[in-house]
Amino acid sequence: MNCLFCKIIAGDIPSAKVYEDELVYAFRDIAPQAPTHILVVPKAHIESCNGVTAENSAVVAHIFEVIPQIAKAEGLETGYRVVSNCGDDAGQTVHHLHFHILGGKKLALEMA
């Protein structure tokens, strides 16, 4: 297993966990881009958004049920951003589908 996030989920690499259930693992980013920066990943290895299929899309729907719970627990009542990079040109550095929750300050309108 060479996937960094698979190793984190397995407990082989430590992380600052903020949420876990049978399908999803969420932890604080080690290089935060905002005061609150959490990564939410499916436990099943899916390489990117391009790997979402009819067979595994339920986990993505579940992630979007979990994200508001995490945001509320983190005190992000005034807003937060959810981002997923897909592919090298988009800035995806770990090839395991993940969603960034960014918040804790007023975020810039520019996305790129």
Give short role names for the model-derived ranges.
Residues 1-112:
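HIT superfamily nucleotide-processing domains
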